[in-house]
Amino acid sequence: MEGEERGYWRWSKRDFFPEESFQSFGSYRAALSQTCSRFKNRLVSRSDDENERFELKKQSEHEMKRCLTWWDLVWFGFGSVIGAGIFVLTGQEAHEQAGPAIVLSYVVSGLSAMLSVFCYTEFAVEIPVAGGSFAYLRIELGDFAAFITAGNILLESIVGTAAVARAWTSYFATLLNRSPNALRIKTDLSSGFNLLDPIAVVVIAASATIASISTRKTSLLNWIASAINTLVIFFVIIAGFIHADTSNLTPFLPFGPEGVFRAAAVVYFAYGGFDSIATMAEETKNPSRDIPIGLLGSMSIITVIYCLMALSLSMMQKYTDIDPNAAYSVAFQSVGMKWGKYLVALGALKGMTTVLLVGALGQARYVTHIARTHMIPPIFALVHPKTGTPINANLLVAIPSALIAFFSGLDVLASLLSISTLFIFTMMPIALLVRRYYVRQDTPRVHLIKLITCLLFVVVSSMGTSAYWGMQRKGSWIGYTVTVPFWFLGTLGIVFFVPQQRTPKVWGVPLVPWLPCLSIATNIFLMGSLGAMAFVRFGVCTLAMLLYYFLLGLHATFDMAHQQIVPRT
């Protein structure tokens, strides 16, 4: 009966598709015939703070346990970020794209990431829900924009987990004094998919299992592992500078400035894990105090650490000799510290283990909130009554991640992951500006038109700057004299002609609209620095998302919004 307590494990059709549109072939056919009108409705439909914070949480049936403090969030920041970039992508991008200037790539991507961190922090304090960027965009930019973001969040979660798990295998092999690919199974499949990785599958399964047991225990385990990893990082930095050879920094820009920005766009993945902290808001004891400390504190320290580690690697070994699969271990071996490579490999394993562990927590919470809106089946929104964790959501991310990690190489995954991350981070400052300058039923239409016009100036000029850079017209600056002034005009237009409609209650981004507009520009610029194949893969994935949306997601969310849901029995 409706309202009767049910067990967590349930597999009926109505648990996956309780919406009226899916109860029979006739009702589904009728829903498809209304696709255009339903899309128009959802395109302009926006949620609100109260709905996201209170009403949607009822879909989970049980609440998550508030057990985290700012201390936990800082270590979650370390655990989710350090490991993925430094131990996975630094060697690859230094060797192939930037050379010793990889340190500048980390500076560029770090500054851009900090701008995004500001935006995330304001939203997380104002709207402390598990959905993170998905919930924020659903409130400010509407249902369709939130869906595209949801698709990219799932893509980022699945591909990111697979990429780190593949790298885990490489470092484990190095720790055993074998080549990075020694533990993989060679096949006759096409390049990039011909090295099967069963160890990566086991690592993903273990991380998902631990994250499903208890958030508090996962936090404790992450704290211990991250502390060990931090000690290894200090060893790497100090030992790296002790064995530094400044001649390895020459030439500093072997691939030119273009290489720096291409590498920056890829190593941006190194900062992508910080958004996991925002998804912990429902489990944080004091979100308004703890989230700013956790986000801003951890990311500031991490940016400095990344730059120092990248510099130490470049000074230890010539960029042409850097091993793209296990850079630090091989670098220490090259300077005579053969024992050092084992310590570095162990630290890298610790770092990537925490990335997988914290990632499993954050990704499951994203999925939980997306499922609460019925964009994906609501069974994935359920929170287990005993563990207080979303086990079904963990499984939804872990299973496809394991399949991808089993087949796909790191180089195939990295660029696809970066463009997905950059897309989400570009949407966030746009949403923040909408939140500050537009309030439904209060903001005059003329001010809304001014805001949209100014935002178009900022976005289009940023795209123009990125495109002109991508044309590789070395020594020619005439294009920037057109695109950059338009960015300033758009930002100044917001300053002088669009009055702010909302002031943050607790913590807000400083220098609005300048910092959000700068975040838009840097993210779009970095996105444009990626290769053409990254956009092709991104386009294919986006088309797949849209196909799902128009066949399933649109009708499920329409029914949810209009309460056309069959009662659970």
From Swiss-Prot:
Transmembrane segments: 68-88, 98-118, 144-164, 193-213, 223-243, 252-272, 291-311, 342-362, 390-410, 412-432, 451-471, 478-498, 506-526, 538-558
Tissues expressing this chain: Expressed in roots, stems, flowers, seeds, and leaves. Mostly present in leaf rims and cotyledons of developing seedlings.
Cell membrane keyword on record: yes
Topological domains, Extracellular: 89-97, 165-192, 244-251, 312-341, 411, 472-477, 527-537
Cellular component, GO annotation: plasma membrane
Residue spans, topological domain Cytoplasmic: 1-67, 119-143, 214-222, 273-290, 363-389, 433-450, 499-505, 559-569
Protein family: Belongs to the amino acid-polyamine-organocation (APC) superfamily. Cationic amino acid transporter (CAT) (TC 2.A.3.3) family.
Protein name: Cationic amino acid transporter 5
Classification of source organism: Eukaryota, Viridiplantae, Streptophyta, Embryophyta, Tracheophyta
